[in-house]
């Protein structure tokens, strides 16, 4: 037990020193890169055979390509061998002079990370380009907007077509592929859509407007009034001087009726009452038995 403990204490671990590297190089020059376990048995180094081999392969070989990037041929070789052997980095490194298994492993891991980053960026770009929110912001652009015309039959507004504008983009649940710049048409339900905000007085206004227009047309056609036309008709009578009277008369030619005014009311008949008759006239207006029910005034 004590011997085994002593041997374990003799095995050295940790970083290598320059003196140990020099002993290992001299051993390889003399015996070649083999018999790694004999180095410790001969008492040359207190290192295990595995530690001596890895130190030589990864750090002390003369043809190592330390700090050099993989060439295009080396990258192609690693990709082909990895698809054939899998993650056998030490075996793949034997096909690449000057490359260690750690070099191959580091190259492969960095390549995988780079590819994953590229794929992630491309997926983000594709998802943002096909995002429905970004595509919905360009829908519903009304270009051919037709105004609402006024009906000639009345004062109501008749809605013929409903157009799509940018202000109702949030209210119309259609995509840009379905709507676009086209005009939405209402289905024919047999009902005429009319809006008459002043329908309570349209009939009266229209009637007055038509009557006044007809009167204006008649006045434009016949410039003389009915009374003037009657007077002109009487001029053909040979006794029209008797009708008109002398020219120097101050009285009017003829008295025309006033059709636009009501006839004057009948004048009231009033008689003059003297001062002496005022009291009697005032009392005569009361009935005769008015004072029968009045109590006499008591004497003082």
Swiss-Prot record:
Keywords, alphabetical: Activator, Cell cycle, Developmental protein, DNA-binding, Nucleus, Repeat, Transcription, Transcription regulation
Give its localization.
Nucleus
- Expression triggers: Repressed by the microRNA 159 (miR159); the production of miR159 is stimulated by the anaphase promoting complex/cyclosome (APC/C). Activated by ARID1 in male germline cells via specific histone acetylation regulation (e.g. H3K9Ac).
Quote one Gene Ontology molecular function term.
Answer: sequence-specific DNA binding
Tissues expressing this chain? Confined to inflorescences, especially in stamens and pollen.
Q: What sequence ranges are listed for the domain HTH myb-type?
A: 8-64, 65-116
- Name the principal localization, coarsely classed: nucleus
Regions of compositional bias (Basic residues) in chain numbering:
136-145
User: For the region Disordered, what residue ranges are annotated?
Assistant: 123-145
Q: What happens when the gene is disrupted?
A: Loss of male fertility. Reduced expression of germline-specific genes (e.g. MGH3, GEX2 and GCS1). Blocked generative cell division resulting in the formation of bicellular pollen grains at anthesis. Pollen fails to enter mitosis at G2-M transition associated with reduced levels of CYCB1-1. Blocked generative cell division followed by endocycle during pollen maturation leads to single larger diploid sperm cell unable to perform fertilization. Enhanced polytubey (e.g. multiple pollen tubes entering ovules).
- DNA-binding region listed in the record: 36-60, 89-112
Gene Ontology cellular-component terms for this entry are: generative cell nucleus; nucleus
An individual GO BP term: generative cell mitosis
One Pfam family recorded for the sequence: Myb_DNA-binding
Q: Please give the name of this protein.
A: Transcription factor DUO1
Q: What is the species listed in this Swiss-Prot or TrEMBL entry?
A: Arabidopsis thaliana (Mouse-ear cress)
